[in-house]
């Protein structure tokens, strides 16, 4: 079967022929229909410092997908061949304190598909049946293909109460853009998004952001003054940029709450005085709550949340290089690849 493989320890990704996997007793074989390129996939493509210490060459990458059940393991019940599914890309152990305590998203033994084990950029893949998420008929496959990052955005946006609150989002990648839309959809007062990429800031505005700020041209403090704000009640850090995070700390209202998804460089510092003397709460976010986040993000789309506005490109798998080029240049929202 075709698969996108990180063949070499250098920049690039390669379309290769690999064996079709065989599902174990509690697994399901999935025939992929559509997959989406994530920022993590771009890191692996670029072979940056994180990838070099994390990825073993020879890996089939990818973790954002939708497909149909092609074969059931001998012990699997509750699913049918031909059923359309996505899946939680974090495979957890099931026996640690957090898994047994109902907090599997905090499992210290988590294995990520497309990072630690072979992933979804292939014609077929296997997943534990317990990780599957059925996709309702009303949701098109091109949107279901990126439920994984949509779930990251939903986890962040729903971590704290944002109804009637002023929200600052640093980083207008697809996850930040979607999070901005969710915050407005559920009743935030002002949602301000910062970045230096005007293309992606426009997508955030299209999804409902009150103001988008190119911080290379405009002062965030000036925008706050225009909105008659003393500070932000909730911050969502999506950029992984230490300067953006410190700007957020500077602009938070006393007692504010911050959800952090962006991965900071090793050794990055911050102004601890702002966190301490403002009484800020900082919560790390990893993945999605299993499976409450999946339920809520599904219902958001079914209730009219315009997730389609962040989808900018649909390509065939043979055009994968164009997709990675668009992501590298910052000229895309979500890029979806078709395997049909």
From Swiss-Prot:
The active site is at 40 (charge relay system), 43 (charge relay system). Zn(2+) 1 binds at residues 38, 63-64. The record marks 148 as: Important for catalytic activity for the proton relay mechanism but does not participate directly in the coordination of zinc atom. Zn(2+) 2 binds at residues 93, 96, 99, 107. SUPFAM superfamilies: GroES-like (SSF50129), NAD(P)-binding Rossmann-fold domains (SSF51735). The keyword Glycoprotein does not apply. Binds 2 Zn(2+) ions per subunit. NCBIfam families: PRK05396.1, tdh. Belongs to the zinc-containing alcohol dehydrogenase family. This is L-threonine 3-dehydrogenase. It comes from Xanthomonas campestris pv. campestris (strain ATCC 33913 / DSM 3586 / NCPPB 528 / LMG 568 / P 25). The gene is tdh.
